[in-house]
């Protein structure tokens, strides 16, 4: 095999490895793993993937690709956007990172910080999940996860 063919083969393998590593961070299992890890930490059972919710989330993400604005659709959802290689796993980790801002005793976000993405992730009654990811016109990624049943009811604790 000539040097050119070996170089071409190595380049193809590297591209496939990069593609696989990016896609591996956006599979249903990746979204579920981060959700279910966070839920297990507070004694809440795991979620399961719902293809219908995923389809709705993907359609909504696609519809936001023009402006990439985090405008809620009205469904029970968490939204995120990010540049570079922003993945579904990274979006869920971003929501889970709000945990220190949630005070269970008062059922409030502390210090004026955000925590309601986190409370939706661990909402006990939300047992089905579907997520979508779309590339925005500005090059960023828009990620939407839908939950069923909807959580984050004002005045109720997530677990």
UniProtKB/Swiss-Prot annotation:
Signal peptide (UniProt feature, chain positions): 1-24
Gene3D superfamilies in the cross-refs: CAP (3.40.33.10)
GO cellular component: extracellular space
Every SCP domain range: 32-147
Cystine pairs: 68-136, 109-115, 131-145
Induction record: Upon infection by virulent and avirulent races of pathogens, for example fungal pathogen C.fulvum. Also induced by ethylene.
A biological-process GO annotation: defense response to fungus
Keywords for this protein: Antimicrobial, Disulfide bond, Fungicide, Pathogenesis-related protein, Plant defense, Pyrrolidone carboxylic acid, Signal
Glycoprotein in keyword set: no
Function: Probably involved in the defense reaction of plants against pathogens. Has antifungal activity.
Listed name of the protein: Pathogenesis-related leaf protein 6
Organism from which the protein derives: Solanum lycopersicum (Tomato)
């Amino acid at each position: 095999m000539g040097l050119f063919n070996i170089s071409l083969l190595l380049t193809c393998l590297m591209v496939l490895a990069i593609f696989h590593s990016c896609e591996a961070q956006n599979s249903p299992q990746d979204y579920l793993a981060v959700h279910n890890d966070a839920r297990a930490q507070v004694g809440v059972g795991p979620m399961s993937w719902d293809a219908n919710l995923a389809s709705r989330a993907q359609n909504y993400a696609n519809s936001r690709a023009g402006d990439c604005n985090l405008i809620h659709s009205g469904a029970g959802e968490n939204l995120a956007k990010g540049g570079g290689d922003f993945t579904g796993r990274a979006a869920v980790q971003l929501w889970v990172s709000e945990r220190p801002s949630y005070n269970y005793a008062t059922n409030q976000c502390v210090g004026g910080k955000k925590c309601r993405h986190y409370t939706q992730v661990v909402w006990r009654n939300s047992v089905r999940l579907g997520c979508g990811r779309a590339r925005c016109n500005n090059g960023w990624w828009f990620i939407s996860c839908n939950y069923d049943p909807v959580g984050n009811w004002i005045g109720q604790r997530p677990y």
